[in-house]
Amino acid sequence: MDFFSTHNILIHIPIGAGGYDLSWIEAVGTIAGLLCIWLASLEKISNYFFGLVNVTLFAIIFFQIQLYASLLLQLFFFAANIYGWYAWSRQTKDNQAELKIRWLPLPKAMAWLAICVIAIGLMTRYIDPVFAVLTRVAVAIMQMLGLQVTMPVLQPDAFPFWDSCMMVLSIVAMILMTRKYVENWLLWVIINVISVVIFALQGVYAMSLEYLILTFIAVNGSRLWINSARERGSRALSR
C-alpha cells in the first residue's frame, strides 16, 4: 500500500475509545516533528530539514482527510522553515552565526503581545468563516492545478477560543524561532499544554501523549535558550 496513504496503518494504539490507528505517514511526520523541535532547542540548523519533512507529510495528510484550511497553513510553515534555515545559516565575517539567541526588546514584546491578543480575539469570533474562506482558496488552487477535489462539508469549531490560540500562537512562535527569540519557546509551551488538554477532551489520547512529549521538549528548550541569552547579556523585557 502507498506509504503516503493514511490507510496504510503502522500500528493500532489501544488507548481511548476504540483506540487509534497510526498510519506510516503520520508516524514518520510525527517523528520528524519531534526531531525538529528537539534539534531547535539545541540551536541546530538541521532542525529545519526535519521541519520541512514534518509540514510536507502533514500537508499530504490534511489533503487526504480534506482539512484544506490546515493544508494551506502548512504552506506558511513550509516557507517559514525555508526562511529559518536561511536566517540561521547566515554568518558574520568571522564565520560566526549572525543571529544570536536573545530576548525580545520590551517595545517588540509589547507589539507582539498586542498582535496576539487582537488576532486571537478576531479568530475566536470569526474562526468558522475564516476557515471556510481558507478552504475555498485551497480548493480553488488545487482545482487550477488539475486535482479532482470538491468543497468539503465544514463543521462548526468545537473549541473556537482554544483553536484560535493554538493557530495564532503557532504562527507567532514560528516567526520568533526563525529570529532566535527566547519567547518562541514560552509560546510553544503554552500551545502544547493547550493541545494536550484539547486532544484529551476529544478522546484522542495518542495525540495528547505526543503533545505532552512536545511540552517537555519545549520546557527544556526554554531553559537552554534562557541560559544562552543570559550568557550573551540579553535580559527579558529590556529596553
Curated annotation (Swiss-Prot):
Required for nicotinamide riboside transport across the inner membrane. Belongs to the nicotinamide ribonucleoside (NR) uptake permease (TC 4.B.1) family. GO terms for cellular component: plasma membrane. The keyword Repeat does not apply. PANTHER family: NICOTINAMIDE RIBOSIDE TRANSPORTER PNUC. InterPro entries: NMN_transpt_PnuC. Induction: Repressed by NadR. The keyword Lyase does not apply. This is Nicotinamide riboside transporter PnuC. Beta-nicotinamide D-riboside binds at residues 188, 192. The lineage of its organism: Bacteria, Pseudomonadati, Pseudomonadota, Gammaproteobacteria, Enterobacterales.
